[in-house]
């Protein structure tokens, strides 16, 4: 197995919850990250948005708190997801979520 682990903190910009046809609870949030990092000795602004998917009963307790404006830190793995129109995007599948606010 190869390493696939990402830790990212940011602010939720939108959130939705639904159950799959198999009855699995899912919460999907858009996470916006802003920071500054040094690269090659220069300080640069860093910005990204990524969709985060929380699946299963273990997230039921925290899912109700995941609304726009809430700051979280997520640890999980990234996976390629293809939309209905054929667009590819990276999605972060959460394995651990921590509320920061």
UniProtKB/Swiss-Prot annotation:
One Pfam family it belongs to: SSB_1
Keywords for this protein: DNA replication, DNA-binding, Primosome
PROSITE patterns in the cross-refs: SSB (PS50935)
Entries under Gene3D superfamilies matching the protein: Nucleic acid-binding proteins
One GO CC annotation: primosome complex
MF term (GO), any: single-stranded DNA binding
InterPro entries: NA-bd_OB-fold, Primosome_PriB/ssb, Prisomal_replication_PriB
Residues of the SSB domain: 1-101
GO biological process: DNA replication, synthesis of primer
SUPFAM superfamilies given in the database record: Nucleic acid-binding proteins
Record field: transmembrane: none
Disulphide bridges: none
Record's subunit section: Homodimer. Interacts with PriA and DnaT. Component of the replication restart primosome. Primosome assembly occurs via a 'hand-off' mechanism. PriA binds to replication forks, subsequently PriB then DnaT bind; DnaT then displaces ssDNA to generate the helicase loading substrate.
Family: Belongs to the PriB family.
Function: Involved in the restart of stalled replication forks, which reloads the replicative helicase on sites other than the origin of replication; the PriA-PriB pathway is the major replication restart pathway. During primosome assembly it facilitates complex formation between PriA and DnaT on DNA; stabilizes PriA on DNA. Stimulates the DNA unwinding activity of PriA helicase.
Protein name as catalogued: Replication restart protein PriB
Lineage, uppermost ranks: Bacteria, Pseudomonadati, Pseudomonadota, Gammaproteobacteria, Alteromonadales
